[in-house]
Amino acid sequence: MLALLLTTTIVSGDNQIELTEQLPTVMVAVLVRNKAHTLPYFFSYLEDLDYPKDRMSLWIRSDHNEDRSIEITKAWLKRTSSLYHSVDFKYRSERGKRESEKTSTHWNEERFSDVIRLKQDALQAARMMWADYIFFIDADVFLTNSNTLGKLIERKLPIVAPMLVSDGLYSNFWCGMTSDYYYQRTDDYKKILNYDQIGQWPVPMVHTAVLVSLNIAQTRQLTFERKNLPVGRYDGPVDDIIIFAMSANYSGIPMYVCNELLYGYIMVPLEAGETVPGKDLEQLTNVLSYIVNEYGALSLKQDLSRFVADVPKDKLSLSHIYMINLERRTERRTKMLKHFDLLGLDVEHFPAVDGKQLSDKKVYDMGIRFLPGYADPFHKRPMTMGEIGCFLSHYNIWERMVRLNQQEVLVLEDDIRFEPFFRRRAYGVLADARRIGGWDLIYFGRKRLQEEDEKWIDGSEYLVKAGYSYWTLGYVITLEGAKKLLREQPLSKLLPVDEYLPIMFDNHPNESWTSHFRDRTLSAWSAAPLLLYPTHYTGDEGYISDTEDSLRIQEPKKGDKEQLPNAPALLSESGIGQGEHDLETKNRRSEL
């Protein structure tokens, strides 16, 4: 915020005086309808904005609610209203949709007209109070970057929107508009959305979170009302964001979208017939998961937390779910627990075997011997202690499955991100797999290493036959699959777990390694598309590897014995490690 402070230097004779100017005033305009599920987070992030609240005024309107939106807004304002320069909150308490609406997500002309009237009222209110800026923002936007408002003001642009991220291709700007005023696909859209080109970009449309400078004379011509446009020029729909965009166009005022920073997140508006308890709550889970991935936590003020219900937890119809995590990686564990709370997953933390606690002697004493001739395909090195610990962690789970007679288990690592609609998609994958039968393992997340297409499983829309793959981010394994993996006594001919699995389903390119394993009958499938991806890739900021960045084993000297007959029993006795939305050409909306 210090970067925004303006200083004026006055020189009088030999004296020089520096004076500090106050920051511009901003009126924040919000329309609220049926947003009880988003408001606790929306208000928390709005409150977190690093901008002087005594330079901000709030203008909030709400009507036709069927939830606790008004109650939540009142609760937040009760605590915060005194912090802001002024608060203007009006609402209609009668519940239910308009008589002309088919559903609460139906956008008809009456609804558009009401929103147009309210936004025009907000614009006029900002002008009447001589605000320097008006910031229109929807109640399902989460401005996770606390510097958003200040950074936008620094741009000194007449109309600017912070680019917002959704759980798909949807965002709050258009790069093209058709002759009949609707969304047009362009090559530039994805370049901006994917940060392939970064900066401030002139576009024909911004919406959902828009900052307007009221000190620019031409902005007096901006309007949401069709009647205020030049006579005879507009023949488009009754739609607030389109009319506003065209009023800017007719007035010669450029609109910009700014993607120089990650500013925040946006919900995709519901289509007519879609519901808040269904689709929108799933979308909220997706977006909140994105935020947890990026920041490690959510902003939720204590007085608003009572409006957020706990998500009931289950095991996705499986016998058990395990998360492998090193005890010392508390930040990963904390992040994953937040994901499980959001997704409603009942998961047991399974302490990983820590490679840092292993030594050549410990490994040898545990009965572990290494596959003759093994070297990492990329780094041409023997196994690291981290890779040994990783294998033992998975191995211990397979042993526990057999001991406890667990029929189907999901094994998760702790450096994963969940794809949108994870629960629904996971249930779909599992339903297909059980209906078809004949599988031992299903990858939920992996790195595919073969270029050729993988064959679809007959009768399934979600499953393919797994080819040579790396990573064990997440997989479902059956009891029979665990028994197959244990029967080969892999600790007597050890190699990394993500090499062992493809060998066991007989799809590994190294015939020399494969020849050491006889019963390669593991039936392995993969979800398609995948349900899990890594949080970071090699080289990314924040990337940490507990397998690569660890000591390597001492390569055995010629003549050393490579196998012990009872490696699993010795290990057990050691006690170590136990215990996408796309864009539509029609206008999609979310306000009142």
From Swiss-Prot:
Protein name per Swiss-Prot or TrEMBL: Glycosyltransferase 25 family member
**From the record, which residues define motif Prevents secretion from ER?**
589-592
* Protein's organism: Anopheles gambiae (African malaria mosquito)
| Location in the cell | Endoplasmic reticulum lumen
* EC numbers on record: 2.-.-.-
Q: Record's InterPro entries?
A: Collagen_mod_GT25, Glyco_trans_25, Nucleotide-diphossugar_trans
**Residues spanning the signal sequence:** 1-13
The record's comment on protein family reads: Belongs to the glycosyltransferase 25 family.
Highest taxon in the source lineage:
Eukaryota
Sugar-bearing residue positions: N249, N510
